């Protein structure tokens, strides 16, 4: 393995349409990232572990499946091991994963595997899987020295890194303290990239493959390489293009919202809204010419 035992990734959100913020050829941009990761894994002869939301929608459609399979099913491609996130599951149901896009990939691509049970990867590593809807827990026994948890749940870097004010989510140190049985916890769902160490064990949240919203304009998509012997985790930045993300749709929406606010304020200034029905009618008749019959 030339020192690197596995690459950690998450939240690929493979899709056939272009996010509203993107101005480039999004299909091409996705493939460039996949090529980069595949070449890196191929060079080190190691697997790529993807912690959920491999696809953006459960049902991929023939065009997207054809596009992905034709480019990524070569025999020399490295082994991809993915767990399911909510975006991979029809109606968020884990028992339906085989009917979804990732199910088709697992049947069509020899080196693509959807992991849904614990398994021994090699003579050193056991992988414990917690796809969307399954809570991470400590295992009762393991026949391997190194134990890895792959989990798809919202994890934040720390309590100071909430994505919104009253967000309820586990933070990395809490999970590492709660589950000392794992040498590495690989989490997906949070599109930010971070790694947290606690007593020589790591939680790795690789973040999303792509920048899919305007608020990710400053993000640096990455994978992480893990060397078990050295117990080291290195961040590897993926190639990105400049000026492919636009905020125009946000600015347009803000202008529209401002116009609506202005209109509502003018309405409020024009009318004192009163919930006395008879009084409102009288006021209406006074301000508008209404014949006696209508009254």
Regions found by a protein language model. Give the residues of each.
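Conserved catalytic scaffold of divalent metal-dependent phosphoesterases
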Residues: 67-68, 73-74, 81-175
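Short, glycine/acidic-enriched loop or turn micro-motifs at the edges of active sites
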Residues: 14, 56, 155, 192, ...
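Non-catalytic terminal accessory segments
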Residues: 1, 233-234, 241-295
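Catalytic phosphate/metal-binding cores of nucleic-acid and nucleotide-processing enzymes, i.e., regions
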Residues: 15-17, 21, 35, 68-78, ...
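Active-site neighborhood of phospho(di)ester-bond hydrolases with catalytic His/Asp-centered motifs
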Residues: 8-10, 48-53, 79-87, 113-117, ...
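Core catalytic region of metal-dependent phosphoesterases/phosphodiesterases
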Residues: 3, 12, 19-118
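Conserved beta-sheet core of the metallophosphoesterase superfamily
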Residues: 163-230, 235
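Cap/insert and terminal regions of metallo-dependent hydrolase folds
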Residues: 25-37, 184, 213, 217-219, ...
């Amino acid at each position: 393995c030339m020192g690197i035992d596995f690459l950690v990734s998450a939240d690929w959100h493979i899709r056939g349409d272009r996010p509203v913020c993107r101005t480039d050829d999004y299909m091409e941009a996705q493939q460039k990232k996949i090529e980069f990761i595949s070449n890196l894994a191929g060079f080190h002869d190691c697997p790529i572990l993807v912690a959920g939301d491999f696809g953006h929608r459960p049902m991929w459609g023939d065009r997207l499946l054809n596009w992905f399979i034709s480019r990524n099913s070569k025999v020399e491609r490295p082994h991809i091991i993915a767990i399911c996130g909510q975006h991979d599951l029809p109606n968020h149901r884990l028992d339906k994963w085989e009917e979804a896009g990732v199910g088709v990939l697992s049947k069509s691509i020899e080196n693509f595997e959807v992991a849904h049970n614990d398994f021994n990867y090699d003579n050193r590593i056991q992988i414990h899987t917690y796809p969307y809807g399954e809570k991470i827990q400590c295992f009762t026994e393991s026949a391997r020295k190194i134990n890895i948890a792959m989990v798809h749940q919202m994890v934040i870097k720390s309590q100071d890194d909430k994505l919104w004010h009253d967000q309820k989510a586990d933070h990395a140190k809490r999970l590492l303290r709660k589950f000392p049985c794992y040498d590495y916890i690989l989490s997906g769902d949070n599109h930010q990239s971070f790694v947290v160490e606690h007593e020589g064990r790591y939680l790795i949240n690789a973040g999303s493959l792509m920048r899919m919203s305007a608020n990710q304009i400053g993000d640096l998509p990455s994978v992480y390489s893990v060397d078990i012997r050295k117990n080291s985790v290195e961040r590897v930045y993926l190639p990105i293009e400049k000026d492919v993300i636009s905020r125009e749709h946000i600015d347009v929406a803000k202008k529209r919202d401002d116009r609506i606010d202005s209109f509502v304020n003018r309405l409020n200034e024009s009318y004192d809204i009163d919930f006395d029905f008879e009084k409102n009618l009288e006021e209406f008749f006074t301000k508008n010419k209404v014949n006696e019959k209508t009254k």
